Amino acid sequence: MGKWYQNKLRRTLLDMHIPDWNDEFMRSFDPETYFKALKTANVNAPMIYVQAHTGLCYWPTKVGTMHKGFVGCEDKMKHLFDLCNADGMSTILYYSLIYNTEEYFKHPQWQMRDVEGRGCTFKGSRYGLCCPNNMEYRAFVAAQIAEFLDYFTCDGVFFDMPFWPMVCYCDSCRARWEKEVGGEMPTIVDWNDPRWRTFHEKLNVWMGEFAQFATDEVKRRKPEVSVEHQFGPSMHYWRFGQNELIAKASDYIGTDLYGGIEQQSFACKAWYHLTSNQPFQYMTSRCYPTLAEHTTTKSPDLLRLCVFMTYAHHGAALLIDAIDPIGTIDPRVYEKMGKIYRESEQYEPYLKRGKMVHNISLYYDLNGKMDAENNGYSTDSPQNANTEMDKVEFPHAGAIMGAANALRKHHIPYGVINNGRLDLIERADVLVIPDDPGMKAPACEAVKKYVENGGKLYFSGHSAPELLKEFFGVSFDGFTEENFTYMAPTEGSDIFLGEFTKAHPLPVEKRAAKVTGTPKGEVLATITLPYSVPTPKLTFPLDYYGAPFQGYDREQRYGSIHSNPPSHLTTDMPGILKAQYGNGTVIWSALPIEGVICPQHSEIFAGIIRELMGEKPFAFGANAADSVECILFEDGDEKLLSLVNLQEDFHTMPAVDTEVWVASDRAPKAVCSLPDEKPVAYRYEDGKVKIFIDRFKQFRMFAFRF
């Protein structure tokens, strides 16, 4: 039978972050009504709150505080668990770590503190934050875990919020730093400072250790119960302190994200290779665009798109609703959910088959989520505000999301591997390391070995100066002063596919990496600079109130008042290098062209990938609209190909005239559409099994059987 999470893929969660200052709050919550709604929604694994960010509990706790709405009806939530368990559903218990407003105010010594010693409510936050380094708070968490495991019968536990919402300087953090490192905790962000880098590493280690502590508390009491930790900040800036250690503390991983369907596509691939066990879980709200809009609901097409993007990656879907403060729900939400889940259920027998197939591996470094050139600001600065991957506030995010975008639109099979699974590097036909400032020695050694043994590598920008020295014999020498630079092809080089020339070079709004020394191999492009160093911000005609910088000087020189066009003189600074190393091939770019969302840059990056692939065929391909994504799984003599139409609109228009193919050295016995198992006409030619889909709206799945 396997673990419950391998079989129960239709999940939901009802947010219950409700205070109790109003006597009506949560009084109308009825477990029978909600259970019926779950049945209507065709859910087979509900996640159920027993406590919330408020810190208030939904059971008669002895060590915490029960919500006043449950006084006199203390067993309501237990009754809901019992109803679901008796029906054959698998139940996941929700508990909030760190975000505990009730205990925050009860225990000032538990509070997270900023660099000035102020708690988080100083700035008006509703959320009270307790520090995981405080041993009294940990003891409280352990006691609560013991209580809820004794009181409720559940199949899994979901721990929310194991991350640093702020950089904490409480007494507990200061004491731990003093013990493990010594001296004052750093307060200024400086990626050139070894102590700051140590501090950054400690944030990750401390949070990973806290997550493992919570997991261990569950496992030593009920080892059969699964544990999952919120993993959303793995997509966010450095300050959240989440890396692969959170994944290792989880039986499987997942989270809720709100960056749109392209971010979800990337996250599904990243989590596929990050999770300890399949399937991963993808969560998102039914509210549009986020839970902040309490009474809005995404269109059926948007909800369906989210569910089927997850299913295309053989993941488990979880849709989030939010309870009304008095404890009621909108039953119409569950009717909509049910229609989608009844449709998705038909595909579930196929989701347990095979492994994801891809030729290109994008390397996502969970320790590289910083802007290494942005230094000298306080940890309490607004620069540390909610910076998320979809907002592209750090170089590695912009580059890797751009690479994913380009490969997806060119229907090139790609996956996302990570620094926690260096063993996956050797499986790549082509490895891409996009503008990663966080690579450590073990990863560099694994990449070197991979290339030496015949691997193909593309890396760019900030990535691994030591590899630049190893592969090309040149030394990294910082970045250009100019923050808008160009690359021009060298004589005889077609690296830019004719899209850009020496006179009209390729533009990137970034500082270019500089090197010293004579490079090994070929120089395919060189750096071209603008006529002058651009001002910190280009102030467009109507943008008088933009961020201030040094005032205008009449003698200021520029090439154009609206832009920073290239000068007529190119430099001899290498822009793109190519060399053989051992049995492998390496291409390096001084600028992360993969991160630029522009058709020419996308085409050029795809061309570089094709050049590195050489004669080896891709696992699949398509003649299809940019909005069509293909995902392939292989299980022995069967290949399962999913197509997703990524139009992120309220109402999706069908994709038309789509031709897709999978590579094979033999003709198939049959090609069938799923889940109806109807035969599909195909052609087998030139090592490809081709099918044609006249039109489809959002999702199709096909089985190629050999």
Feature names for model-found ranges:
Residues K39-D75, Y99-G124, F152, M166-W177, ...:
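Aromatic-lined carbohydrate-binding/catalytic grooves of carbohydrate-active enzymes
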Residues Q647-A667:
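Surface-exposed beta-strand/loop patches in extracellular or lumenal glycoproteins
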Residues M1-L56, D87-M89:
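N-terminal structural segment of carbohydrate-active enzymes
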Residues L93, L97-F152, M161, W177, ...:
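Active-site-adjacent "subsite" loops/lids of carbohydrate-active enzymes
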Residues P437-T516, I609-R610:
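A glycine-rich, often tryptophan-bearing local segment used as a flexible ligand/cofactor-contacting loop or short
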Residues Y49, D155-D160, V189-D193, R197-E201, ...:
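Hydrophobic targeting/anchoring helices
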Residues D30-P31, K36, I48, V392-F471, ...:
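Helical hinge/lid and interdomain linker segments adjacent to catalytic or ligand-binding clefts
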Residues L14-F29, W59-D75, K123-A142, N192-E209, ...:
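The substrate-binding groove and active-site-proximal loops of carbohydrate-active enzymes
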